Structure formats: C-alpha cells, structure tokens
Amino acid sequence: EIKEADAILSLACGDGTQTIVKNLKDKPVYPANNTLFIGEVRRVGEFEEACKACGECELAWTGGICPVTMCAKGLLNGACGGARDGKCEVNPENDCAWILIYDRLKSINQLDNLLDIKEPKDYSKSGNPRSLSLKKKEATAKA
C-alpha cells in the first residue's frame, strides 16, 4: 500500500514522523500532530505530560513524581508558596506538584528526602538535539 501512496500522513509524534522520513526517502511525509510533550494517556482523547527527558532523573527522591515536568516552574527545592487549595498558581487547573510530592513522600515514610538542598539542574545533559547508540565501542588497541 505504501508503494502506491503519493504521500504519508504520520499520526506519530515528531520523532515517529522523522523516523518514517528516514526510511521512506522517496515519499513526502506529513505530520498530523504537533508534538508538545512525552506523555501518558489519561483516558481516550486526554493525555498528561510525564517526562521532559532532562537527563537527570529526579524520581528516586521525589516518590516518583517529577518536579521538572509537573511543576510549572520546574522547582527542585519545594513549593513556590503560591499554590491555592492544592492547585498551581501558574495553571490553577493543575495540582501543585510539590503538594503531590509531599503527600507521596509522607505516604511512603520518606519525608526526609526533602531535607537536602538540590543544586540547579544541569540542562546541558539533555544536550539537544541528541542521539543514542547502543552499539559497543571497540576497545582501543594499546601500544
């Protein structure tokens, strides 16, 4: 069917569309979506952003709730103080990430995780655009 097609309409994210382009060099490929985030399906037609692929995962000490993604300000050392009724001051439709993190850590008896001051995130580790190779590097011959 692809051979007969004049073009390809990709329903994938931007990465998926680019993968198709690399494999179908003789056909135009058009994206049907504007990728805004890496997310999860909440329910049909509703999605939640889950990861910004920052290169320094914070989930181990935050009880599995990402402050980089879930906090509108990307704060790493606790809430900004602007939340009202558990909602984010930047977008009141969203729960405050730090209230969620606090509640989660309390429920798993790990509130001590909040005592350490976190250094600013090193976003250079995300190094956009990135590539990844799973091939083993050949050992360099020693002279």
Predicted regions and their residues:
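Iron-sulfur (Fe-S) cluster-binding modules
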Residues: 1-8, 22-35, 39-61, 65-143
